[in-house]
Structure formats: C-alpha cells, structure tokens
Amino acid sequence: MDALLKEQLAEGESIIWQGVPEPFETLDKTNKKRFWITLAVCIAAAAALVVLYLANIKGEPKPAVLVIILVLCGFAPVRRFLYAAAVRKLRYLVTDRQLLIVSNEVKRVSLSRVKVCALRSDADGHLSFLAGAHALKARPSHWRDLALTGQPNTEPDEPVDSFAFYAVADKAGLRAVIRRVLPNVQM
C-alpha cells in the first residue's frame, strides 16, 4: 500500500473493496455533445473578444493579448481530454469506515456522512457511484468532473454533497460493497 493512502487510514481500518475506472472513450455518447457545445461557445467567445479588442484599441494591436484570449478560450474544450486522462488513473477504495479516491492526492469521505447515494449508468453503460445531493442532480456528462473535483463538505457533521466513482470496472463488486457498508442509505 502506498504511503499516501496509508496516511489516510485509521488504526485497524481495513480496505474491503478497490476498483478502477473501466476503459472509456473521451468523446463517448455521454460526453460528445458537451464537448461540441463547449467548443462552439469558446469559439464564439474568442471571436467576440478578438473583435472587441480590435475595435477598441488605439494604435497597433498587441499580439500577446490576442494569444492570451485564444489560449484562455481554448482551455475549456481541451479540459475534457485532460479530465478523461486523469480519471483513467484514479483508484477507488471502500474501507469499513470511508470512501476514498486516490490519484496524486486522496479525497475521502466518512461513510457516516453519506446520506443519499445511487449507482447509475450513463448512455454508454458506464456504472458510476454518486454520493450527495449535488452529485445525484448532476447530468451524466458531469460525472467525470465529480470524480476529480467533487468535494465532500468540510464540516465533519454535514452530509457529503458531491462525491463520485466514475465508470467503475468491477460493477458487481461495487454493488455488493455499497449494499454492505451503506445498508440504511437511501439509494
């Protein structure tokens, strides 16, 4: 067990399930539409900003300003690919006390803070575990983001708001362990 994970486990706490995301396409059915909409909005925003800049400058245009506009507007569509690559490297763990997502950092939430959760599949058949009111309201095209950026509330007594295991490869194992460790949670 790596040192980063070992630090997150309490004395006597045991890992009862581990999983990883199953293989998925970056622009699958669930995420393709969001990518194209984001790309169209970014192109329109970049064009509008360039036109505004060129219309309001006095003297010669500064190429650096144009480059900054294009780079900033180009980041949003590229982010879909960066997030997909990052999700592929995640490890999901369930212990007898908490849920963990391990990458270059560890995100965790105590099982006692999970008040609502669901196992849901997207249009591509990828099963994801969603915990918290915000996660349950999220569209399937946002589930990858939740696995990377979903934040449990910082208050120890507050229920988790947004936590997700995206596209779990071991579907049967995840279903069984969730029923076991969260038997009283609304699913």
Regions found by a protein language model. Give the residues of each.
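Conserved beta-hairpin
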Residues: 75-115
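Short, exposed beta-strand/loop patches in secreted or surface proteins that constitute
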Residues: 8, 92, 116-120
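A membrane-cytosol interface segment of integral membrane proteins
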Residues: 126-187
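Acidic, Ser/Thr-rich low-complexity segments on the non-lumenal side of membrane proteins
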Residues: 102-143
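Short, charged cytosolic
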Residues: 1-21
